[in-house]
């Protein structure tokens, strides 16, 4: 009985969400098809209920007594890193729902299934974060991927959305096959799937035969390539720009922040814990991905004319910084990677809050901005929005004293401790180059001339509040930067074991 309670206790938030998903599904099916009620639209109701469910799940997680143990026959882990990451996921999801709520009303996404899929995707992300076994890792990632394929193609009347979902499905299925094949190779050669057991096994790597070492290296490479694909790291980034562009904007925001944190947490467990004895090997792969990600993300962003493709390439560049922090393989690198992800997520929430609120009014209808040229002379239409976006872009570029500067600084300091001077100089140079396309956008807002005047649609109060909150966080983090630094360091302590 005690073992059963220890298994149930760490996943109480997931059980709570799944039970509510079943209730919402029954509620949606019964009421949306009711003739007496006139076939009501339930999307707004389910959106508010989803927000309440996630709020209650965060409270359940936050007030749980912390237990540093594994559960479900060591399939899941509940350490300090997992505990804090789950809290961050719930806060991000709440912010995402509040930011995108007005967009869903504007775009008339009236299907109640939308919110059920979002809740299931969040559960899948939570399972990925807690995974402590190759089997649960694969099943959780597949659970997440199947939902993401549907969400990417949710706009059935849009050719771009259908293309995005199909392309994501084909390439995602290929990467899942690599993950499964790599896991089966490792299990076939070792008979182990648990992360901690694999870490103990690989301490005797020098005693293995050459054929076994080649097989294990091949299996590990396939797993690493699959996870880098899910993280949209170059040269495995081909799907990201098209999927970001074709998906609904709210889903694009979801793709750009939620899976990043989940896959990063999984990478940290695999590279730092299970396969730490392969460090000389996986450092080469990670280093190649860093160079390609930062170079392709930076240079490709120059030629983009659409917002979502621009953000896709910008996020690929930031993935390079995630991996750069992992490259050091020490506690400072883990801490700086967590710090960088937190700053990145808050910045992306702020930028998408701007994109979702920037709607232009044309007689009898209003439309959302899609092109970067819509920013021309924005300072004349709405100076407050122009200043807000300027600060967010400066933060993405790493201009002091904004949050993005400290995030990049901590990553570079962790890399310099390992005396990796060459990659550090390369990253600094590419960061300087990336400043040009951010400054180019700022120039168009303040100094470019406009051919015709545009009328901005009134900004939603909730979106303006969230935009202001994220802006204050990014702008004034230097006043109490130790708070986030302590949090990220505390989360990294679980890897000391």
UniProtKB/Swiss-Prot annotation:
What InterPro entries does its record include? Answer: NADH-Q_OxRdtase_suN/2, ND/Mrp_TM
- Molecular function per GO: NADH dehydrogenase (ubiquinone) activity
Localization of this protein: Mitochondrion inner membrane
An example Gene Ontology cellular component term from the record? mitochondrial inner membrane
- TM segments? 11-31, 40-60, 87-107, 109-129, 134-154, 169-189, 213-233, 253-273, 278-298, 310-330, 338-358, 386-406, 422-442, 466-486
Q: How does it sit in the membrane?
A: Multi-pass membrane protein
* Biological-process GO terms, alphabetical: ATP synthesis coupled electron transport
Alphabetized UniProt keyword annotations:
Electron transport, Membrane, Mitochondrion, Mitochondrion inner membrane, NAD, Respiratory chain, Translocase, Transmembrane, Transmembrane helix, Transport, Ubiquinone
Q: Which reaction does it catalyse?
A: a ubiquinone + NADH + 5 H(+)(in) = a ubiquinol + NAD(+) + 4 H(+)(out)
What Enzyme Commission number does this protein have? 7.1.1.2
Q: What class of enzyme is it?
A: translocase
Source organism superkingdom: Eukaryota
> What's the stated role of this polypeptide?
Core subunit of the mitochondrial membrane respiratory chain NADH dehydrogenase (Complex I) that is believed to belong to the minimal assembly required for catalysis. Complex I functions in the transfer of electrons from NADH to the respiratory chain. The immediate electron acceptor for the enzyme is believed to be ubiquinone.
The UniProt similarity line reads: Belongs to the complex I subunit 2 family.
Fetch the NCBIfam families from UniProt.
NDH_I_N
Protein's name according to its UniProt entry: NADH-ubiquinone oxidoreductase chain 2
**Record organism:** Chondrus crispus
């Amino acid at each position: 009985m005690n073992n059963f309670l220890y298994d149930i206790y760490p996943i109480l938030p997931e059980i709570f969400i799944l039970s509510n998903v079943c209730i919402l599904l029954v509620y949606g099916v019964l009421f949306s098809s009711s003739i007496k009620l006139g076939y009501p639209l339930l999307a707004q109701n389910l959106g508010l209920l989803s927000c309440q469910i996630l709020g209650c799940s965060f409270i359940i997680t936050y007030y749980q007594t912390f237990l540093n143990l594994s559960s479900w026959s060591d399939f899941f882990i509940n350490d300090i890193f997992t505990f804090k990451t789950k809290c961050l996921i719930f806060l991000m999801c709440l912010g995402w729902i509040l930011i995108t709520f007005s967009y869903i009303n504007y775009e008339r996404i009236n299907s109640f299934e939308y919110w059920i899929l979002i809740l299931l995707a969040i559960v899948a992300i939570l399972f990925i974060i807690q995974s402590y076994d190759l089997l649960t890792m694969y099943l959780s990632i597949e659970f997440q991927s199947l939902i993401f394929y549907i969400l990417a193609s949710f706009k059935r009347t849009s050719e771009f959305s259908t293309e995005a979902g199909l392309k994501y499905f084909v390439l995602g299925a290929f990467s899942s096959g690599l993950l499964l094949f790599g896991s089966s190779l490792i299990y076939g050669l070792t008979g182990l799937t648990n992360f901690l057991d694999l870490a103990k096994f690989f301490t005797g790597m020098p005693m293995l035969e050459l054929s076994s070492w080649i097989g294990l290296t091949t299996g590990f490479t396939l797993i690493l390539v699959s996870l880098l694909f899910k993280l949209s790291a170059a040269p495995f980034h081909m799907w990201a720009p098209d999927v970001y562009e074709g998906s609904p904007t709210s889903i694009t925001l979801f793709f750009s922040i939620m899976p990043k944190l989940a896959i990063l947490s999984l990478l940290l467990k695999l590279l730092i814990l299970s396969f730490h004895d392969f460090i000389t090997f996986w450092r080469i792969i990670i280093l190649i991905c860093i160079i390609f990600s930062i170079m392709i993300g930076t240079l490709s962003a120059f030629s983009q004319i659409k917002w979502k493709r621009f953000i896709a390439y910008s996020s690929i560049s930031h993935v390079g910084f995630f991996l750069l922090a992992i490259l050091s393989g020490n506690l400072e690198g883990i801490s700086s990677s967590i710090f960088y992800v937190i700053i990145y997520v808050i910045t992306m929430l702020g930028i998408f809050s701007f994109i979702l609120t920037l709607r232009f009014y044309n007689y009898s209808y209003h439309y959302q901005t899609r092109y970067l040229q819509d920013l021309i002379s924005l300072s004349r239409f709405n100076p407050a929005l122009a200043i807000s976006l300027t600060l967010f872009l400066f933060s993405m570029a790493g201009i002091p004293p904004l949050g993005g500067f400290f995030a990049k600084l901590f990553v570079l300091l962790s890399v310099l401790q390992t005396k990796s001077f060459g990659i550090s100089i390369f990253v600094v140079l590419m960061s300087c180059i990336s400043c040009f396309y951010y400054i180019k956008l700022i120039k168009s807002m303040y100094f470019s001339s406009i051919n015709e005047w545009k009328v901005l649609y009134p900004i939603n109060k909730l979106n303006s509040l969230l935009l202001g909150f994220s802006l204050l966080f990014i702008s004034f983090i230097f006043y109490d930067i130790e708070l986030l630094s302590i949090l990220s360091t505390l989360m990294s302590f679980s890897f000391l074991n």
